[in-house]
């Protein structure tokens, strides 16, 4: 890991209140890594989301259902501790024992770079996700 990535992860952790941050190339891959790590096989999420979300579920063989629940900044994959926080970046936004997947890019809260990140508080999972990313 480069020094600039390490510094960005530390600053993002401080800003969001997350004990650990793992950067990725996009939010979709952050979600995929969390589902793989946690071996999630079923979930429910809003029908009005990014097309890459159901595509990722299909790729992973996850049984999913759509809900008509409206969302604004972020939503939880119901039945899991994983959140799609693609449109959210706020001070102290981290939720304990959760995996919040962020997105950086055009029309997102941090739009001068392209990428993603996972906010979490489990040190062992942090180490595993770092190796997977």
Role assignments for model-derived ranges:
Residues 5-43, 53-60:
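Phosphate-binding glycine-rich loop
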């Amino acid at each position: 890991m480069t020094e600039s990535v390490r510094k960005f992860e530390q600053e993002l952790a401080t800003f969001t209140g997350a004990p650990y941050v793992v950067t990725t190339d996009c939010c979709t891959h952050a979600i995929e890594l969390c589902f793989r790590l946690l071996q999630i096989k079923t979930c429910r999420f809003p029908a009005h989301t990014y097309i890459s979300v159901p595509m990722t579920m299909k790729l992973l063989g996850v049984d999913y259902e759509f809900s008509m629940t409206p969302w604004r900044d972020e939503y939880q994959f119901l039945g899991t501790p994983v959140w799609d926080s693609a449109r959210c970046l706020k001070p102290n936004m981290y939720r304990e024992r959760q995996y919040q997947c962020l997105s950086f890019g055009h029309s997102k809260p941090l739009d001068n770079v392209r990428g993603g990140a996972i906010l979490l508080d489990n040190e062992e999972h942090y180490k595993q996700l770092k190796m997977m990313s």
